Amino acid sequence: VVEEAIITEIKATEKAAVIREMVYSLRDSQKVNSKDVENIIKALIKREELGSTGIGKGVAVPHTKHDCIKKIMGTIARSTKGVDFNALDGEPVYLFFLLLSPNDSAGAHLAALERISTVIRDSDLRRFMREASGKDGMVEILREVDGIQV
């Protein structure tokens, strides 16, 4: 997780805008090259067209693999109002875990997705992340969860 790119209150109110804002936060943290931003956003939106990454219980995990990504990375965003992300349970999404991986890292990408899904199954963790006081509070919660690198 790129700590500098965590968004404690995302401004976006719809799916494509959430994805865009999260990728921009990685660009602003100098983890994604400006020239690659639009291609990454397109790849994430294309992935969403295959099936929503809104997995339910207020969580979405937009993810993609792309040639321009050299190292697996991710960030987190939170919405206090909730966003319609076409989640599988039809409920709004409050927590977004974005994952970007190099094209040649299928195993690591799947392992990271598995780790994220394991962690967010915990209803207490989801509640704590939604209620955390700012970025520092969110980071502290992640650090307490075994295996999350911030």
Where are these regions (language model features)?
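Cytosolic covalent-transfer regions centered on His/Cys nucleophiles
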Residues: 1-150
